Amino acid sequence: MANHVSSLKRARQTVRKTAVNRANKSRVRGSLRSLREAIQKGDVKAAQEQYKATASALDKSVQKGILHANTASRYKSRLNARVKALATQAA
């Protein structure tokens, strides 16, 4: 266990930040799950709406330093391709 005042403070900060980061990651994963379910069902309108929400959640997590920018970009690119493929398939 930490003994110095500064290391005790850092330990407290880590606990708080870990909780916040875990909540944000969970929110992003839930959004990704909802989008994948909409794509799986073949619901174009719901998939497009959910993609907007998911892209926003990914961008926010990048701004907060939870995800790397390239990781979020990769997710958005692949998911957008799946949504567009679903839209062209339905049309």
Curated annotation (Swiss-Prot):
Superkingdom in the source lineage: Bacteria
Region described as Disordered: spans on this chain: 1-31
GO biological process, one term: translation
One Pfam family here: Ribosomal_S20p
Molecular function per GO: small ribosomal subunit rRNA binding; structural constituent of ribosome
The keyword Ribonucleoprotein appears for this protein: yes
Alphabetical UniProt keywords: Ribonucleoprotein, Ribosomal protein, RNA-binding, rRNA-binding
Listed GO CC annotations: cytosol; small ribosomal subunit
HAMAP family given in the database record: Ribosomal_bS20
UniProt family annotation: Belongs to the bacterial ribosomal protein bS20 family.
Function: Binds directly to 16S ribosomal RNA.
Name listed for the protein in its UniProt record: Small ribosomal subunit protein bS20
Record organism: Acidobacterium capsulatum (strain ATCC 51196 / DSM 11244 / BCRC 80197 / JCM 7670 / NBRC 15755 / NCIMB 13165 / 161)
Gene it is expressed from: rpsT
